[in-house]
Amino acid sequence: CNRMSYVVEAAIGIDEKSATATRGWFRIDPAACRVVLQGALTADRILLNARALGVYGASPIPQSGNDTLCIAQENFVIAAARQCRTGQTPAPFTQITPTQTDDGNLVAYLAEDSEYDDEQARLAGIQRLLVIAGYDAAPIDGVDGPKTQGALNAFLKSRGLSADVVQSPNFFTTMIDAVQS
């Protein structure tokens, strides 16, 4: 689950017995969750690498970790992820320990130092993209106020979008497309 103010792409690494595999990219919007593994989890270790979308510039997400595993630029599944081949790049992965939810699923959260809850992460993500698009929605703090609403309304009006699009599940895709055009 993403509790950051960035739209991220995540890659997972699975260590099982003597084999390590990686898979990515899973796009996760702020305040959203993605299923990245299904079925019984038998892995010895689960590892994670995350990157912010290119629209943010240099990735603001620290690239650190104790394991170096192979990734690719586009979507990938790499079976032997400790020896990179052509088109694959070594990247740092961090071991994660998901927690069990009430419904029995395992969940792990990506978070910033600001420790946003889901609602704050979503709003901070919108503020961040508004600032990149040239609207004054600063500070990026996940707090709703007249300045954020004014910037959001100006953005929607300039793109000919109705206010209800903000609640749609594809709103971050809509914003990123607008920022990149």
Regions found by a protein language model. Give the residues of each.
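Cell-envelope/ECM-targeting effectors and their regulatory/trafficking segments
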Residues: 1-3, 11, 32-34, 45-47, ...
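Short, surface-exposed beta-strand/strand-loop-strand elements in extracellular ectodomains
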Residues: 7-16
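Intrinsically disordered, low-complexity Pro/Gly/Ser/Thr-rich segments with frequent PxxP/GP/PP motifs
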Residues: 17-43
